[in-house]
């Protein structure tokens, strides 16, 4: 007896869906990624271009043939490296300015929040500082040229505008008193005025330079004393931003450079400011535990190590040119080497952690005022009662 066989036919459809039916979403994801990057971008990223521009200025001074204190090792530094560094700084600065301009167009509310933030508002000076340093280190322009002077005013006017707004708030606005908002980042405004003072002195505008220098130094003394007293505003400074403590080094170092350009010589005042920055640097270096929490994960705030040390290196070069002794040459060699090594290390770390660059910054996403959280809690408690 034969059992009837049943045949089973299996058909496999290998057809590929059309492009209309199958979408990867990559084309739609690109604008989303760009918008997310713009939303996360803030003025603190100009620390990168600020470091590049200050490093270019250091190299320009070190390879200058008229520098009498430069040893034969420094005199052989290739000028091509300086030109490459300057153009890299230019590309970085233009790129950051372009991206930040896009943020102002598409996310103006975020820019406004940054302006109201007690830390973020200080870094609105950073683009102007970078441009002024780039102008002073430019290899193709002389300070007496019309183009140089025009660009100087274009970059210096935003500094004066922010001075009037920010310093005016410290004096007159009850909720924006310096005693409540003071933090190490407040020294960025001081550095901006001092960099502008040096630029004016290089052009021979001594009256303008003295005006900017006096404005910067008066507010530096006020900020320094306020921070030294450890008032409530300083206690709200996030641990991840502690590299910004090196701005304590940058401010007197830049003041020394500006005064040297105004007077034409590295006199006693310039030396006093240099020694102050040197003392503060040693004080910070002797306290590595202060920066332990901030070094756990890469953050763009790490660039705050670079440009203050470059300012100190620039100061040491000017000091060595004045004293012409082994101690001055040794300080110049030490701080120039440290500055270059820190700068190169930051370049490598930034390239290795490029995927972390444009992430949401929880610091700027916090309250715009250090007292806002306490006020919010008290209001909630009142409403519950």
UniProtKB/Swiss-Prot annotation:
Any one GO MF annotation of this record:
voltage-gated monoatomic anion channel activity
Q: Which GO terms describe its biological process?
A: chloride transport; intracellular monoatomic ion homeostasis; positive regulation of anion channel activity; response to salt stress; response to water deprivation
Q: Composition bias, kind Polar residues: at what positions?
A: 376-385
Chain ranges sitting on the Cytoplasmic side read 1-42, 103-114, 172-176, 229-243, 287-299, 352-385
Q: Where is this region: Disordered?
A: 366-385
* Cysteine pairings via disulfide bonds: none
- Can the keyword Transmembrane helix be found in this entry's annotation? yes
Q: Which keywords does this Swiss-Prot/TrEMBL entry list? A: Cell membrane, Ion transport, Membrane, Transmembrane, Transmembrane helix, Transport
What is the annotated tissue distribution of the protein whose record heads this document? Expressed in the vascular systems of root.
Mind telling me which residue stretches traverse the membrane in this protein?
43-65, 82-102, 115-135, 151-171, 177-197, 208-228, 244-264, 266-286, 300-320, 331-351
Q: So what family is this one in?
A: Belongs to the SLAC1 S-type anion channel family.
PANTHER family attached to this UniProt entry = S-TYPE ANION CHANNEL SLAH1, S-TYPE ANION CHANNEL SLAH3
Can you say what this protein is called? S-type anion channel SLAH1
| The species this protein was found in | Arabidopsis thaliana
């Amino acid at each position: 007896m034969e059992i009837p066989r049943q045949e089973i036919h299996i058909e496999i459809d290998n057809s590929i869906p059309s492009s209309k039916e199958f979408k990867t979403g990559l084309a739609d994801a690109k604008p989303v990624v760009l918008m997310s990057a713009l939303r996360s971008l803030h003025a603190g990223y100009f620390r990168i271009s600020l470091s590049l521009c200050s490093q270019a200025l250091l190299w320009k001074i070190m390879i200058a043939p008229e520098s009498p204190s430069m040893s034969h090792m420094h005199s052989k530094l290739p000028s091509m490296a300086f030109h490459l560094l300057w153009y890299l700084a230019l590309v970085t600065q233009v790129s950051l300015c372009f991206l930040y301009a896009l943020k102002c167009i598409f996310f103006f509310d975020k820019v406004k929040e940054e302006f109201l933030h007690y830390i973020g508002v200080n870094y609105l000076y950073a683009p102007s500082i970078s441009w002024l340093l780039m102008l002073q280190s430019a290899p193709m322009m002389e300070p007496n040229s019309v183009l140089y002077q025009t660009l100087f005013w274009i970059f210096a006017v935003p500094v004066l505008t922010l001075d009037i707004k920010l310093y005016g708030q410290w004096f007159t606005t009850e909720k924006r008193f310096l005693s409540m908002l003071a933090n190490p980042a407040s020294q960025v405004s001081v550095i901006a005025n001092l960099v502008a003072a040096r630029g004016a002195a290089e052009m021979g505008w001594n009256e303008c330079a003295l005006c900017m220098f006096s404005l910067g130094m008066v507010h530096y003394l006020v900020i320094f004393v306020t921070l030294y007293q450890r008032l409530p505003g300083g206690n709200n400074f996030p641990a991840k931003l502690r590299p910004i403590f090196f701005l304590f080094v940058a401010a007197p170092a830049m003041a020394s450079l500006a005064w040297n350009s105004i007077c034409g010589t590295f006199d006693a005042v310039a030396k006093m400011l240099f020694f102050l920055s040197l003392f503060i640097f040693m004080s910070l270096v002797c306290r590595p535990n202060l920066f332990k929490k901030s070094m756990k994960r890469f953050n763009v705030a790490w660039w705050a190590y670079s440009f203050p040390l470059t300012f100190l290196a620039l100061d040491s070069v000017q000091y060595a040119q004045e004293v012409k002794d082994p101690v001055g040459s040794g300080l110049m060699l030490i701080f120039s080497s440290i500055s270059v090594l820190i700068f190169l290390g930051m370049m490598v770390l930034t390239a290795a952690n490029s995927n972390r660059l444009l992430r949401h910054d929880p610091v700027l996403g916090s309250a715009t005022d250090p007292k806002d959280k306490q006020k919010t809690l008290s209001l909630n408690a009142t409403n519950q009662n």
